[in-house]
C-alpha cells in the first residue's frame, strides 16, 4: 500500500499535501512530531485521509512518561494505524490495544546503522503488534541487496526500507519485496526520511504494476552518468512489462558478493557499464559469442539462476554508423581508449574492412587491443599526427583529449552531450555523432535479449527521441 507522509508543518500545508495526493494514494502517515497543528486540526486532517497512520518520533529530551501520554492521546483520535517505536514500553502498548482494539499497531525501528533485520525481527516479534517496520542504513549496493534478501524470508506484515541515497532502490522494489507499506512524500514536498521518493517518482518506476512476481532490471558500475532509468522505465511501461529498471552503483571489489546475491533475487537483466565490462567476465556462467570475441560484456541475462553475458556495444555503434551512412570500407578509423566499450567497438569494426588505429593513455593497453583486432596502436598524444576519416572517442568526459579533427567524430558518452573535444571538432567542420545514439541502439539490443518474445518496433522511435531530449538537458561540457 502506497502511503504518503504528511509533514506540513502548518495545517494549510498539510491539507494541501493530502489533497494533492488523494488521486494517487489513499493511505496517509501523519508525522505528528513535524506538524504544528492543534488536536482539532489533526482530526480534520484525518477526516480527509481515507486511511490514516499516526506517528510521533520521540525527541531525546522527552521523558518516558510524556511519551506514553502522547501516544495514548493519539490513540484516542482513533486512527487506522498507530506507529509505536521499538522502545515504547510493551505493557503500555498492550494497554492501548485493550482500550482501542480497532487500531492496528505498527512496531517500528529507525536506525542509521546497518542492522541484521532477521535478528531484530526475532527480538521484536514477541511484541503484540500487527505490523513491523524496519528503516535501516545500507552503505553499499551489496549491503542493500543483502537486506532485500533478508526481507524475503520475513513475514508479509514486515516493511523494510533502506535509508539514504544508497537505499533508494529498496523503495522502488517495495512492492516486489511485499512490503505492506511503501512510504512516499507528497509531490512537491521535501523528503521526511533520507532518500524518500515522491509519489510521482514511485509511479515513474511503474509502482502500480509491480508485485512479488515482477522481475528486476538494473544498471551496475559507475551509474552517475547514465540516463537509463529515465528512458527504460517509461519504455517498460509502454511495453506493458511490470519491471523496474534501477541504478545500482557497484565497484569491482563488490562483484563476488553481487553475483552470489543476484542469483537469489528476481533479476532478469542487468546493464553493465564502466569500469565493470571486463571485470564481470570471471563471474559469468556462459559467454555469448559477442563476449568471447570482444572480451567485454555490457549485458547480463539471468534465467533460472544462470547468468549469461552478452555484448551489444559494438553492434549498437555499428548500427548508428550505418544509419548515418558513414563509409567504413577501406577507411582509416581512430578509436580513442582501450576499455570495455573500445574493445567491443574495435572487435565489431575489425570485420568492416577498415584500418583501425587504437590511441590510449597507456600505450600497452592499446597494443593489447590492437593485437586482437589487426589494428595499430599509438599513444594518445599521437592522435593529431594521423589523418583518419572517423574518430570514435571511448574515454570518459573527465579525460583530456588532444585536439583532432576528422570528417566524422563520434563520442560514445551520453552525458554531457557536448565535450571540449566534440566542441572543437565541430568548430573545425567535423560532423558529430553524439553518445545518446549508440546508447539507444545498444539498449534496444539488450531489450531483445531480456524480452525475446515481445515486439516493440512501434515504440523504438519514441524511445530514441526521449533519449535525445534527455541528453540535451545535460549538454554542458565539464
UniProtKB/Swiss-Prot annotation:
Residues binding 3-dehydroquinate: 21, 29-31, 55-57, 171, 196
UniProt: NADP(+) binding residues: 337-341, 360-362, 435
Gene3D superfamilies (alphabetical): Aldolase class I (3.20.20.70), Leucine Dehydrogenase, chain A, domain 1 (3.40.50.10860), NAD(P)-binding Rossmann-like Domain (3.40.50.720)
Single biological process term from Gene Ontology: shikimate metabolic process
Pfam families listed in its UniProt record: DHquinase_I (PF01487), Shikimate_DH (PF01488), Shikimate_dh_N (PF08501)
Region called 3-dehydroquinate dehydratase, residue ranges: 1-208
Region (Shikimate 5-dehydrogenase): 209-478
Keywords for the protein's UniProt record, in alphabetical order: Amino-acid biosynthesis, Aromatic amino acid biosynthesis, Lyase, Multifunctional enzyme, NADP, Oxidoreductase, Schiff base
Single GO molecular function: 3-dehydroquinate dehydratase activity
Biological pathway: Metabolic intermediate biosynthesis; chorismate biosynthesis; chorismate from D-erythrose 4-phosphate and phosphoenolpyruvate: step 3/7; Metabolic intermediate biosynthesis; chorismate biosynthesis; chorismate from D-erythrose 4-phosphate and phosphoenolpyruvate: step 4/7
CDD domains noted in UniProt: DHQase_I (cd00502), NAD_bind_Shikimate_DH (cd01065)
InterPro entries on file: Aldolase_TIM (IPR013785), Aminoacid_DH-like_N_sf (IPR046346), DHquinase_I (IPR001381), NAD(P)-bd_dom_sf (IPR036291), Shikimate_DH (IPR011342), Shikimate_DH-bd_N (IPR013708), Shikm_DH/Glu-tRNA_Rdtase (IPR006151), Type-I_3-dehydroquinase (IPR050146)
Catalyzed reaction equations: 3-dehydroquinate = 3-dehydroshikimate + H2O; shikimate + NADP(+) = 3-dehydroshikimate + NADPH + H(+)
EC number: 4.2.1.10, 1.1.1.25
Active site: 110 (proton donor/acceptor), 133 (schiff-base intermediate with substrate), 277 (proton acceptor)
Binding site for shikimate: 226-228, 298, 313, 442
Function comment: Bifunctional enzyme that catalyzes two sequential steps of the aromatic amino acids biosynthetic pathway. In the first reaction, the AroD domain catalyzes the cis-dehydration of 3-dehydroquinate (DHQ) and introduces the first double bond of the aromatic ring to yield 3-dehydroshikimate; in the second reaction, the AroE domain catalyzes the reversible NADPH linked reduction of 3-dehydroshikimate (DHSA) to yield shikimate (SA).
Family matches, as NCBIfam families: aroE (TIGR00507), PRK09310.1 (NF006802)
Similarity comment: family membership: In the N-terminal section; belongs to the type-I 3-dehydroquinase family. In the C-terminal section; belongs to the shikimate dehydrogenase family.
Protein name in the entry: Shikimate biosynthesis protein AroDE
Gene name tied to this protein: aroE
